[in-house]
Amino acid sequence: GLNPNALHQWYLGIYIDAFEWVELPNTVGMSQFADGGGLATKPYVSSAAYLDRMGDHCAGCRYDKKQKTTADACPFNALYWEFYDRHTRLLSHNPRIGMAYRQLEKMQPEAKEALFEKARSLRANLNAL
């Protein structure tokens, strides 16, 4: 996984206008959800569909934003669903993300396992992305 404190230190080191009292809660609490929901009401995770809607992040990308488990599937898709599955106990009661859990429940077991296997493979090979 990621080390939220290392990311926090990185932000402080590269941005001349980064003030710890602002940057620490934003990095650890909001963007990393590393405080378990003390500051943010939901984790900031997204699939390719959301990233594509919010900007031109997918334009020119070698990954297919509509695919989930193929070799050219956008990594964000499998990682998104696997994140929610991995954190079901912590997050499933949160009304702000209930729709994600309802969608996850409707998926066929084989489709879910393919997503989770893809996510495990992605995390094991991050340097190859």
Which residue ranges define each predicted feature?
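C-terminal catalytic domain of photolyase/cryptochrome flavoproteins
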Residues: 1-129
